[in-house]
Amino acid sequence: GGIAIYWGQNGNEGTLTQTCNTGKYSYVNIAFLNKFGNGQTPEINLA
């Protein structure tokens, strides 16, 4: 079990660090992860 949250482009959500540090969520789904895998540096689009 556990609670999951969808974190992404809304500036009112706070930072990813703040979200993780609440201790409320077992899983944090990161929205708009547009570059990943194949040795690439992960990149998120927060525009």
Swiss-Prot record:
It is found in: Secreted, Extracellular space. Residues 1-47 form the GH18 domain. It comes from the Eukaryota. PANTHER family: ACIDIC ENDOCHITINASE, ENDOCHITINASE. GO terms for cellular component: extracellular region. Its EC number is 3.2.1.14, 3.2.1.17. InterPro entries: Glyco_hydro18_cat (IPR001223), Glycoside_hydrolase_SF (IPR017853), Glycosyl_Hydrlase18_Chitinase (IPR050542). One of its GO terms (biological process) is polysaccharide catabolic process. This is Bifunctional chitinase/lysozyme. It catalyses: Random endo-hydrolysis of N-acetyl-beta-D-glucosaminide (1->4)-beta-linkages in chitin and chitodextrins; Hydrolysis of (1->4)-beta-linkages between N-acetylmuramic acid and N-acetyl-D-glucosamine residues in a peptidoglycan and between N-acetyl-D-glucosamine residues in chitodextrins. Bifunctional enzyme with lysozyme/chitinase activity. It comes from Parthenocissus quinquefolia (Virginia creeper).
